[in-house]
Curated annotation (Swiss-Prot):
Role summary: May control the interaction of photosystem II (PSII) cores with the light-harvesting antenna, regulates electron flow through the 2 photosystem reaction centers. PSII is a light-driven water plastoquinone oxidoreductase, using light energy to abstract electrons from H(2)O, generating a proton gradient subsequently used for ATP formation.
Membrane topology of this protein: Multi-pass membrane protein
GO cellular component: chloroplast thylakoid membrane; photosystem II reaction center
Entry annotated with the keyword Thylakoid: yes
Keyword Metal-binding: no
Domain of life: Eukaryota
GO process terms (BP): photosynthesis; photosystem II stabilization
Gene3D superfamilies: Photosystem II PsbZ, reaction centre (1.10.287.740)
Subunit note: PSII is composed of 1 copy each of membrane proteins PsbA, PsbB, PsbC, PsbD, PsbE, PsbF, PsbH, PsbI, PsbJ, PsbK, PsbL, PsbM, PsbT, PsbY, PsbZ, Psb30/Ycf12, at least 3 peripheral proteins of the oxygen-evolving complex and a large number of cofactors. It forms dimeric complexes.
Compartment(s): Plastid, Chloroplast thylakoid membrane
Protein name, entry field: Photosystem II reaction center protein Z
Family: Belongs to the PsbZ family.
PANTHER family from the UniProt entry: PHOTOSYSTEM II REACTION CENTER PROTEIN Z
Organism annotation: Jasminum nudiflorum (Winter jasmine)
Length: 62
């Protein structure tokens, strides 16, 4: 169970880092938002899901 928690935390950190870099790049590009809107929303949904998953796993481990 601890390994699953560690992998979930790693995935959350990796997704946060990717979104931290990619979202400003999408907003700065001329047609970036209209062409990459679905990718940004998918990444944000993944991030929110990982936050809840890490919270649930943390309550099970502690």
């Amino acid at each position: 169970m601890t390994l699953v928690f560690q992998l979930a935390v790693f995935a959350l950190i990796a997704t946060s880092s990717i979104l931290l870099i990619s979202v400003p790049v999408v907003f700065a590009s001329p047609d970036g938002w209209s062409s990459n809107k679905n990718v940004v929303f998918s990444g944000t949904s993944l991030w929110i899901g990982l936050v809840f998953l890490v919270g649930i796993l943390n309550s099970l481990i502690s």
